[in-house]
A protein has these predicted regions:
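Structured mid-to-C-terminal alpha-helical surface segments
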Residues: 1-42, 52-60, 64, 68-266
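Glycine-rich beta-strand-to-loop/alpha-helix junction loops that act as flexible
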Residues: 44-48
Length: 266
């Protein structure tokens, strides 16, 4: 595979240069993971899944988010992880730089930077955020990713739509109008008609209602908190002007749609 040629093909699909490079790098890692011995020890999450299920280049993301399943986040295990996914013909995958501790809003994990190279002297540098999927009672979904450089799909586990919805909502509930994860709002709106209501309520129980660090104990509490956040004028103003509105929908319509979704669950 020639990295430079593949990037040109991806750009022809509507991606800019940065996101074309990221898409190719992500697909290389996903393909390598699917072929590796660790394919049942990881679950893919975040923007890569959102972009894949929506099939919308506007939801493209530069990073790759992975949670380990029954696999340690220790540095030595991360290095073994890289060794295991360096398994594609004529493609080299290696870690560069240090393994970083990662602490963001409502997220703790590690970050690694990787270099992907072909045999033509081309290379890409990207980053992977790594965490741990701790609650094994929340089943992961088997999903086939379209890989941009081959007609063969890559089958891996992903966070379900219901889990993604719940985790995005959980962050919004915790930080309220101080949340800066505006893209999550448009993701919530997109996911709302796609989730299974029964499984969603199970995720709410696990990640929100039964979490002693959360203040919400039922749907009424969620609606009350979300309504208060959405009524904040500063939050609405920032949401209206954000560049992360990948749906290109009116932000007021999006907020109303999310609230309507919650009220329908009552």
């Amino acid at each position: 595979m020639n990295i430079k040629e593949q990037i040109a093909k991806i750009r022809a699909q509507g991606y800019d240069q940065i996101h074309a490079e990221a898409r190719l790098c992500q697909d290389i890692i996903i393909q390598a993971l699917a072929k590796s011995t660790l394919n049942q020890n990881v679950t893919i999450k975040g923007g890569v899944v959102m972009r894949s299920i929506s099939k919308d280049a506007r939801r493209a993301t530069r990073d790759l988010d992975i949670d380990f399943i029954r696999y340690s986040l220790e540095d030595s295990h991360i290095d073994n992880f890289i060794k295991e996914i360096n398994c594609l013909d004529r493609i080299s995958i290696m870690r560069i730089g240090d393994i970083e501790e990662l602490k963001q809003q409502d997220y703790h994990g590690k970050r690694i930077h990787i270099k992907v190279s072909d045999t033509y002297g081309n290379s890409l540098i990207s980053k992977i955020d790594l965490g741990v999927h701790k609650d094994l009672s929340i089943k992961q979904e088997e999903y086939c990713f379209d890989i941009c450089f081959t007609e063969t799909n890559a089958s891996l586990l992903i966070n379900s739509k219901e889990q993604m919805f719940t985790e995005k909502l959980r962050s919004l509930l915790k930080f309220g109008s101080f949340s800066t994860r505006y893209k999550d709002i448009f993701d919530l709106y997109y996911l709302s008609p796609l989730v299974d209501k029964k499984f969603l309520m199970l995720c709410f129980e696990k990640y929100i209602f039964n979490d002693t660090g959360m203040k919400e104990n039922n749907l009424e509490d969620i609606i009350r908190r979300v309504t208060k956040t959405f009524e904040n004028s500063s939050y609405r103003r920032k949401l209206k002007t954000t560049e992360t509105n990948w749906l290109k929908k009116d932000s007021n319509e999006v907020l109303e749609g999310i609230l309507h979704f919650f009220k329908k669950q009552m």
